[in-house]
């Protein structure tokens, strides 16, 4: 009995895993159903635009075109009628004959051109925004550059006192030179006086000449 008892719980886990696999398989199937194809309104507009009839496309001709495109007309008959009504109310299609979904339908050219124009306007409006953004960036760049100019100017102001100090030193130096010149002149005058005092010394040999021994 001890050998058969652990075999029962070992068989239970695979039974629990199987429903998880089934759920995982169901999710992609649901996603495929949703993304089976484009909506009915797009198919109707394409079929009406492709037709060359001036009076418009009838419901029977529209169903044939949808069936040729691979759309299940029998199952989605109510959706086709609702799609036609919604497109007429929006203005994308114009009903040329009949009432409701039983008449003939034609593509509204004014609505098609009107839809194209707002897109072009939006694209044109988007460009000035980018230009405005670029202008803001340039303004920010210039605003950031102005402090640099002020920073450059401040050292110049600091340099001016240094230049003034140099001029003061230059102004003081001539005074020293002027004060030094009189000293040199005094020395030269003293030197000039000394030779005058030396002249009487030359007369001494004359006194010694008359002496006789």
Swiss-Prot record:
Phosphoserine, modified sites: 2, 104
Keyword set includes Cytoplasm: no
Residues that bear N6-(2-hydroxyisobutyryl)lysine: 23, 26-27, 46, 52, 63-64, 75, 81, 85, 90, 97, 110, 117, 121, 129, 136, 148, 159, 168
Region feature Disordered, mapped onto this chain: 1-41, 95-213
Sites of Phosphothreonine modification: 146
Modified residues (N6-crotonyllysine): 34, 64, 85, 90, 97, 159, 168
Ranges that cross the membrane: none
UniProt free text on domains: The C-terminal domain is required for high-affinity binding to chromatin.
Official protein name in the record: Histone H1.2
Organism in which the protein naturally occurs: Bos taurus (Bovine)
